């Protein structure tokens, strides 16, 4: 895992967009973002049990696996959105970027590769893309039935109950 400030320059979303300014993992924690490097399935199982994740599935994001809809899907994952549930991803193979909004509404880019697990709190604005290799295989963990419902950023999501709870939580974490 490597985290840094997104450079905001034009260009393919799958490029690194590295500003050269690193972000300390402690800052990610202040945003409510949790990171683990996991080397075995048993560690994933332990984390799932501890956090009450009951279901899981796997997704492969690649042109070979998704065919003609790959570019459309990658663009949809990159729309800024939030979820009303935690988003938990364990990278099984390949790599990709999660971008999360900072307290100042800037993007923090988090590069994840095989063995990295990230937990995004419900209500955080974020987006995802593969890196330039165009290949990410990930396990998705869920507390209940598997679902992935993005709520794209807008006035309505700014007032969303889960967004408001996240902002209160973030203020408490930063204190």
Swiss-Prot record:
EC number: 1.13.11.54, 1.13.11.53
Superkingdom of the organism of origin: Eukaryota
HAMAP family named among the record's database cross-references: Salvage_MtnD_euk (MF_03154)
Keywords for this protein: Amino-acid biosynthesis, Cytoplasm, Dioxygenase, Iron, Metal-binding, Methionine biosynthesis, Nickel, Nucleus, Oxidoreductase
InterPro entries associated with the record: ARD, ARD_euk, RmlC-like_jellyroll, RmlC_Cupin_sf
Entry-linked PANTHER family: ACIREDUCTONE DIOXYGENASE (PTHR23418:SF0)
Gene Ontology CC entries for this record: cytoplasm; nucleus
Keyword presence, Metal-binding: yes
Entry annotated with the keyword Protease: no
Chain positions recorded as Ni(2+) binding sites: 81, 83, 87, 126
GO biological process per UniProt: L-methionine salvage from methylthioadenosine; methionine metabolic process
Organism phylogeny: Eukaryota, Fungi, Dikarya, Ascomycota, Pezizomycotina
Annotated compartments: Cytoplasm; Nucleus
Protein's pathway: Amino-acid biosynthesis; L-methionine biosynthesis via salvage pathway; L-methionine from S-methyl-5-thio-alpha-D-ribose 1-phosphate: step 5/6
Cofactor dependency: Fe(2+); Ni(2+)
Annotated cofactor note: Binds either 1 Fe or Ni cation per monomer. Iron-binding promotes an acireductone dioxygenase reaction producing 2-keto-4-methylthiobutyrate, while nickel-binding promotes an acireductone dioxygenase reaction producing 3-(methylsulfanyl)propanoate.
Pfam families per the UniProt record, alphabetical: ARD (PF03079)
Functional description taken from the UniProt entry: Catalyzes 2 different reactions between oxygen and the acireductone 1,2-dihydroxy-3-keto-5-methylthiopentene (DHK-MTPene) depending upon the metal bound in the active site. Fe-containing acireductone dioxygenase (Fe-ARD) produces formate and 2-keto-4-methylthiobutyrate (KMTB), the alpha-ketoacid precursor of methionine in the methionine recycle pathway. Ni-containing acireductone dioxygenase (Ni-ARD) produces methylthiopropionate, carbon monoxide and formate, and does not lie on the methionine recycle pathway.
UniProt protein name: Acireductone dioxygenase
Catalytic reaction(s) noted: 1,2-dihydroxy-5-(methylsulfanyl)pent-1-en-3-one + O2 = 4-methylsulfanyl-2-oxobutanoate + formate + 2 H(+); 1,2-dihydroxy-5-(methylsulfanyl)pent-1-en-3-one + O2 = 3-(methylsulfanyl)propanoate + CO + formate + 2 H(+)
An annotated Gene Ontology molecular function: nickel cation binding
Residue positions binding Fe(2+): 81, 83, 87, 126
Family: Belongs to the acireductone dioxygenase (ARD) family.
